[in-house]
Amino acid sequence: PSKHTEIQEAALRAYEDEENHRIAYNSACTEAHGYGTDTRLIEIMKFMHSCGYKRIGFAFCNGLKNEALEVTKILEYNGFEVVSVVCKNGATPKTWLGIEDKDTVRGHADREVMCNPVGQALALNASHTDFNIMMGLCVGHDTLFLKYLEGPVTVLAVKDRVTGHAPLAPIY
């Protein structure tokens, strides 16, 4: 399907939109000027600066709260205003989803709080962020977050507890 002329023409027309053009242009420049030398976090910050983004939404997993705190400090030090929302926002017990004890991490559905990626997205939408960063949301939770988030977003890191958050490691 990537060779269909109609699809490629529609794709190029999409870049005529001011926001799409700015994102594509600054992404290409960020890639060119940091290729192989800048970390993902540095690339994200350079990209956000070049796009003029200031108010940054940050959706993260509670399991990476220490890392999220460090990332927040770095972003703020570099001039960004950070609005963060943890996955456990709302503090709703997993029983609300119909989850039973046998299907929980610790065996107590009534005391285990569900992740709320829809809540993360809606909170960031309501905060009118310029740009958003997602870090470490569970598989499926990331899907719901992306489905409900209205603004542009990038992924800083995905969670993989087995590989130290490097999910491609097993294929090398």
Predicted features, each with a name:
Residues 66-117:
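Long, charge-dense
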Residues 39, 111-126, 137-139:
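Active-site glycine-rich loop that binds ribose-phosphate moieties when present
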Residues 32-36, 107-113, 131-132:
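Short, flexible loop segments at the rims of nucleotide/cofactor-binding pockets, characterized by
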